[in-house]
Amino acid sequence: MRILRGSPALSEFRVNKLLELCRELSLPVTGIYAEFAHFADVTAELDASEVQKLEKLLTYGPTIEEHEPEGLLLLTTPRPGTISPWSSKSTDIAHNCGLDKIARLERGTAFYIERSEELSELQLIELKAILHDRMMEVVFTDFESASALFAVSEPAPYTEVDLLTGGRKALEDANVTLGLALAEDEIDYLLESFTEKLERNPTDIELMMFAQANSEHCRHKIFNADWTIDGVKQEKSLFKMIKNTFEVTPDNVLSAYKDNAAVMTGSEVGRFFPDPETRQYNYHQEKTHILMKVETHNHPTAISPWPGASTGSGGEIRDEGATGIGGKPKAGLVAFSVSNLKIPNFVQPWETDFGKPSRIVTALDIMLEGPLGGAAFNNEFGRPNLLGYFRTYEEKVNSHAGEEVRGYHKPIMLAGGLGNIRDEHVQKKEIPVGASLIVLGGPAMNIGLGGGAASSMDSGSSSEDLDFASVQRENPEMERRCQEVIDRCWQLGDANPIAFIHDVGAGGISNALPELVDDGERGGIFNLRDVPNDEPGMSPLEIWCNESQERYVMAVADKDMATFDAICKRERAPYAVVGKATEERELKLEDSHFDNTPIDMPMDILLGKTPKMHRDAKTLKANNPAIDRSGIEMNEAVDRVLRLPTVAEKTFLITIGDRSVTGLVARDQMVGPWQVPVANCAVTAASYDSYHGEAMSLGERTPVALLDFGASARLAVGEAITNIAATNIGDIKHIKLSANWMSPAGHPGEDAGLYEAVKAVGEELCPALGLTIPVGKDSMSMKTKWEENGEQKEVTSPLSLVITAFARVEDVRKTITPQLRTPDNLEGLGDTSLVLIDLGNGKNRLGATALAQVYKQLGDKPADVDNAAQLKGFYEGVQALVANDQVVAYHDKGDGGLFVTLAEMAFAGHCGVNANIEALGEDTLAALFNEELGAVIQVRNDDLDAVLSTLAANGLEACSHVIGSVEASDELVIKSGESVVIERNRTELRTIWAETTHKMQGLRDNPACADQEHEAKKDNSDPGLNVKLSFDVNEDIAAPFINTGAKPKMAILREQGVNSHVEMAAAFDRAGFEATDIHMSDILTGQAVLEEYNGLVACGGFSYGDVLGAGEGWAKSVLFNDSTRDQFENFFKREDTFSLGVCNGCQMLSNLRDLIPGAEYWPRFVRNESERFEARFSLVEVQKSDSVFFNGMEGSRMPIAVSHGEGRVEVRDNDHLNAIENSGTVALRYVDNHGNPTQQYPNNPNGSPNAITGLTTTDGRVTIMMPHPERVFRTVANSWSPEGWGENGAWMRMFQNARKNIG
């Protein structure tokens, strides 16, 4: 083992946060210094040149002054016996750089602890706990101990459970020790199956496989159970009531209840992808259907939030990719419900500390870490995250089960999304006998063991070690490679080699492989030692049942194996043939190492007629008093509700997630010139050549279930509809729903409540509306139990139904946002009015509202959907208005009620509101804070009569009220008649609304950046995003050259982990280039030669997952490979070529500066000042330079998509910065909304000196930039754009310039 020192690992503010934690724990720590330590496992001694190459490879990241370490050494490393994602990616880079003697690289962090006195044993344990994550790391006290990272253990054998002599007791003991979560009747079933049918003892691996495959998590036993309620046998199971929605309204559903995701009818559009033979990008006109799936990952997120949420998103993405015979994930959502945050020094009046068990983390930690995990996976995979919700609830209430603490100690972590699939690929094919059964993706590791069974238990029912063992680890860059393989397969059309595919999720391959062959009506014979395995010491049970992520299983016919193998090699996606499909429905697993057969059983024992569950439930009704108003004052109520996290601004959850990748995002969360996160729904374009698209929205009103189960379920459906109504869908039958049910099954009253809620939507509301629920998920163990000081405690979740609505969109340009408009920012607007559509019909019920929660109350009667026909009329009326362009702004009424709706619209519009609520009743508190369904729309007064007439025609006349007007002011004034009810300054309210996001950012990110962003929100003079162009955006200067028919050749270059290549190809294609897909593996293997191309673009993403520095690993694979280096150097020297590097490609090309003429002053790009991935829509100004891309654009100011974690320009010193400025190579700078270059965050999202974000060479042929012009080349893909732009956005001009430059 060779040990190499790395760069410092922690910035000053990260060190300060650790020291603060030490002070809180009263540890005598006076200083901390941390640096990376690298460990190389070599197969032979490295020569001097190889050592030099390795040292250069491991020099990356920000240049921080080195520190000669002193103090106590605590070395954190990945757990011995595991291989971290960092290790696998950095080892890949080393091999691609020719360092073949390196078997493996690994990285640790060396902490040097200075202390005022020696640490006691207990203090040392506490210190280690804050320095490492016990889920995946260990702590050593010397470097030599790290050799354990490369130790190889001997394989462990399987064990038998002796039922033949030990009987039922032996199985009961195994149930506990292995954490199988078997029910009593399942124990009986297994006992009978093995002792009477098979007449042998089971192996531990067979029992674990059975437990995973038949867990509540995988088999949904409660939803398939027979029910008796209050002594009356019920006719239908829960699942049958859900399926009733499909029986009543099967319209537009192509696949339901049988695959990894549901499929609905999409649009016919031109899908843009490379031709499988020529690799040239083209449009392919075809039916492009819509995938939809929403998962939960609650249990792992409670134990370890980052990996729990990250693998939750990763698993849902795999579900979409594994639909039919290959789907394409497109846009995601992430949502959370947790208990009260109790932010330090910001604890709110309604937040009581009810305690928690030690095995789970706090709600605050979940929300500091979990969203980062979910965002990081989506970011690195390359899927925009466009939707979410965030609810906090934890209160002692008197509901149907009496007084108890209800809340989300077991959180909800929701991960979902939509994708696309070809018409001919919706249904899976037949598995041929003898087909190869394949595992595609990463290796087996001893992680995530028993996750399916563990998540099926109430939190606290299993041992703590089993809880920790059941959490997985993530490697999104590996999943991206696997998806590229799936993409290449479906792009082959009828020649798609995939016959059958499933993702690997709960239960690992022990669930996925049996499911694969069973669904394909086959059996399978497998060899355990063919499963790719990074931990040779694992037992057969651990190899077969672990939940290592980023894996798919599939069947490929022998005739298609050569095609499949070539695709995998090109994409560098590992795969293994682990078995063959058999005619006999038997499952056999052979182990060549021990020469035995750990599994040999008929499929019908594993997945056959296991005992059916029966639920006997009793109805309990809540009887709670109305809200006590005596302590509620209007202005204080306003402040409290705006601070409730469910209502408050969510920016800290949004800007961490890429919202522009694909270039197909038509509506993200951020709205208008001030980028306020209040969008009603998410919208994507179906293609680059049309305005058809897809939309998704969320609906949930879970606290209502504490008063009325059915109402909570109906409101969830209703809210999803009032949200998605903001876009142009048409017939309601184009909307399909996912229903995610979370319940504390078995808790008093909850089972009957669950049945009532499912019946309310499945048998009643959805059929009445014409809505179908073709997909969903259930999580039936939403309770946390623990013992504290000898007292039994529990926190029980409310029944929680989360509805996600998905829809085909006719025209994405017609999507309406909540941004109020005034004549000064919308030409020809004229006078406007605000209209409230109140589907509560004046009932104004306050039960289980945000208002009730912030006063620690529940109330009696909640909002409800009293009239399904009226809700349908609302949808149809709003759709008519949207289609006719008669709505200026739209916002649904939800958490916080009418007051919050009006406030959020004013925030988005940076304006005032003058409203009068006299028509809503005398009870102004109830009128403003009830959460009945509805919406507020802004309409032109010229259209007002027509709008009211349309609403009346849809049965909404009695509930539609003109309540006020929009004012070009900073005041929110609400009156009732002549009495002023609320008169508040908008900026002041906006600041209060932002406090939660500010506090959370300050705890999680660089607090200086958090403070700057919060201060900026107080600036009422901020003009918002604006545009100043030196050219006509609607002129196509490339058209004359395109008309000649000549198409210059453009190399669209990607490396493993790059994810922005398709939109880049689309931009160059539109400008008249012949865009060709080139993978770095094509260049390294000689399949592609750069000299054939006129232009080269290095695309954005996460090459090698950004290990060894963003873009640096990619660059070093060029620099350290002589033939590849020569090819790039020769290309850059050719005077008839041009090159562009964007984001990751910018970072990569900046590291090739020695090969690029005129780039000698280029800087490096390192970690953002905020130390956080930044996804922003930032204003930049084009500088005077010779860049071929920016010819004629000098002085133009326009917003652009920014998405990076390492975009800060790093210079050696001031002389270097001056040399850059004096060379005339600065091409782009960040500017504030007044047009001035800025260092202020977030206008300068990464802290780059002199606001530099784009550079060119002295001759202008090579340009690099961190922002993403390719994602916003269409107007519709801009989060905000001014009126008057046509199809092309302003950034299309730089691609047209490139074409014009060639002539």
From Swiss-Prot:
Residues 1050-1303 form the Glutamine amidotransferase type-1 domain. One of its GO terms (biological process) is 'de novo' IMP biosynthetic process. Residues 1011-1021 have a biased composition (Basic and acidic residues). Its EC number is 6.3.5.3. It catalyses: N(2)-formyl-N(1)-(5-phospho-beta-D-ribosyl)glycinamide + L-glutamine + ATP + H2O = 2-formamido-N(1)-(5-O-phospho-beta-D-ribosyl)acetamidine + L-glutamate + ADP + phosphate + H(+). The active site is at C1143 (nucleophile), H1268, E1270. It is found in: Cytoplasm. The keyword Membrane does not apply. Monomer. This is Phosphoribosylformylglycinamidine synthase.
